[in-house]
């Protein structure tokens, strides 16, 4: 997917495309040509482009040019340099959940700390303090998907057992409806399939444990994002009740919020990084 964003009061995605190219060289060539089409259509002066952000479900090294861990997708550690061959602009790599967290923080003006929990093909997250992303000493900060929720529980793709990812990634729900998450939530909404309703209730039970733990650790708002988060608005009160039952300090669970960006939050965040940097430099 490609998104183009400008600097303004609101960030407006101009175009999204999906490429079906599977071969490495073909993919990058397609990416290059599609980017050129977008720029020709929307940008009269490409010298004003601040940069290109590449958002990936991997752990990024501190230089934002190399990958230190990749299991969800097959990405080489030096993929940055391949991108550079095809994209003739300043370029950085971003963890997808961190980017999405930055997008949500920007949307909320960034004045309050937030925790963003991404519930997509894998589970990740971000801890935002203002527009600053906490990445940790080794770039593995906020890898919430690998918090242990059930000791010796289900096997995770990391080869450990009991990780949140094994209980709350989007496929836990979408697998019931042939990989179609929208269809799953439509079935739940219809209220006739008790099996799916019970599966979603169990999903929320595990998710509530995770969100409660995040509240205890960070004492700030927790935003539900990713593929599943986009569908949580209709179920948020039920979910808040589950989380509040675990909390010894407060019964008000309004700190749990649903993401603003229902799709492509990580793409927005990768663009916001450059915009935020530019705005800060103007103020210096």
Model-derived regions, located:
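Hydrophobic "anchor" residues
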Residues: 11, 66-67, 133-134
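Short glycine-rich anion-binding loops that position phosphate/pyrophosphate groups of nucleotides
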Residues: 57-59, 120-122, 228-229
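ATP-binding/phosphotransfer module of carbohydrate and carboxylate kinases, centering on a glycine-rich
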Residues: 1-48, 108, 152-155, 160-284
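Glycine-rich phosphate-binding loop of actin/hexokinase-like ATP-binding domains
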Residues: 111-167
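Glycine-rich phosphate-binding loop and adjoining helix at the ATP-binding site
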Residues: 14-40, 47-113, 234-246
């Amino acid at each position: 997917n490609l998104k183009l964003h400008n600097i303004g009061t609101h960030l407006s995605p101009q175009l999204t495309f999906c490429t079906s190219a599977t071969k490495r060289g073909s993919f990058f060539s397609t990416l290059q040509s599609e980017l050129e089409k977008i720029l020709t259509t929307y940008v009269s002066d490409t010298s004003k482009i601040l940069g290109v952000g590449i958002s990936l479900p991997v752990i990024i090294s501190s230089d934002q040019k190399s990958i230190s861990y990749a299991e969800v997708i097959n990405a080489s550690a030096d993929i940055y340099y391949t991108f550079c061959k095809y994209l003739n602009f300043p370029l950085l790599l971003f963890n997808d959940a961190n980017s999405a967290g930055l997008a949500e923080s920007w949307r909320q003006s960034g004045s309050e700390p937030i925790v963003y929990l991404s519930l997509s093909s894998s589970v990740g997250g971000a801890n935002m303090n203002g527009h600053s992303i906490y990445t940790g000493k080794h770039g593995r900060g906020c890898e919430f998907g690998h918090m242990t929720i059930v000791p010796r529980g289900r096997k995770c793709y990391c080869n450990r057992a009991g990780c949140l990812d094994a209980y709350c990634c989007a496929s836990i729900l979408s697998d019931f409806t042939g990989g179609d998450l929208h269809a799953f939530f439509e079935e739940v909404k219809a209220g006739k399939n008790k099996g799916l309703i019970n599966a979603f209730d169990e999903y929320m039970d595990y998710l509530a444990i995770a969100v409660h733990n995040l509240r205890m650790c960070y004492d700030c708002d927790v935003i539900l994002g990713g593929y599943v988060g986009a569908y949580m608005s209709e179920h948020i009160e039920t979910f808040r009740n589950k989380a509040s039952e675990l909390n010894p300090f407060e019964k008000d669970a309004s700190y749990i919020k649903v993401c603003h960006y229902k799709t492509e939050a990580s793409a927005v965040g990768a663009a916001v990084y450059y915009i935020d940097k530019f705005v800060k430099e103007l103020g210096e």
